Amino acid sequence: MYREFEEFVFNNYDFNEPAIKRKYYHSKRVSTISKKIAENLAWPLEDIKLATQIGLLHDIGRFDEWTMYKCFNKYMDHGSYGAYLLNKEEYEKMFNIKSYDKQEVLDAVYYHNKLKLPASLKDNKFCKLIRDADKLDIIYQLSQREIVMENNTHVISKEVFKEFNKGTTITNKHVKTYADKVLSILALVYDINYDYTLELLKNFNYINKIYDNLENKEFYKDYFDKI
C-alpha cells in the first residue's frame, strides 16, 4: 500500500516542491490516524485496512491540483477530482483497490472535503472516519505555525459569526479576515464524529497551541472557551 503510494508520488511529481512534500506527509499521517481511530473503534481487520488505505489516498487529487495551478482550493475540488482518478481502472489496479471496496473508497474520497455529508452517507463509517482523521491532522498542522491572512484584521464577518454560533463548520468562501480564519479552524471541531478523535485532539493539546500562537489573544478567548 505505502510502496505503491510512494512510487506514484515520486514518479509523477516534483518532490522538491514543498507543497508536494507537505501533501505527501499529510497523506501518510492521515493514514496512520485513520488506522488508529478504526482500531480504537474495534473495527474488523479488513475494515481497518480499508480505512488506512482511504487515509492514504484521500488527497490524491491534491498532487495534480498543485502541479497544474500552483495553488490549492481555487480552481479544483480535490475531493471530487481524487474520486474521478480512483475510478479509473489504472488507479484501481495501481493501488490494489478491491472491487467490493471501490464504492466505499470513492465515496470517502469524494466527500472528505465537503462541508457536510449528504443524507445518504451521514452514517457511513468510512466517510465519517476520514473526515475526522483529515481534520485532526489539519488542526495539528495549524498548531505548528502562525496563522497568516492577507486581511490581517480582528473583524469577524457576519456570515462566519452566524455559522460559528450555530455550531457548524464555516463555508470557505465566507472566510475573509484573520478573525474569520481563526473561527473556521475552531469550527472544525463541530464536525468531528467520533469521541476518540476528540480525545486525541485534547490529549495532543492542539487547540491550546493554536491559541498560544494567536495575535490579540484576548479577542478570541471566549470563542476558544466555547470549544
Which residues are covered by each model-predicted region?
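Glycine- and acidic
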Residues: 14-18
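His-Asp-centered metal-binding catalytic motifs of divalent-metal-dependent phosphohydrolases/nucleases
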Residues: 48-74, 78-82, 86, 103-115
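Divalent metal-dependent phosphate-bond-processing catalytic cores, especially two-metal-ion Mg2+/Mn2+ enzymes
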Residues: 20-28, 32-44, 57, 68, ...
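Acidic/histidine metal-binding catalytic segments
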Residues: 42-53, 92-111, 122-129
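Short alpha-helical hairpin
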Residues: 1-13, 54-60
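An active-site-proximal "capping" alpha-helix that borders the catalytic cofactor pocket
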Residues: 29-37, 76-91
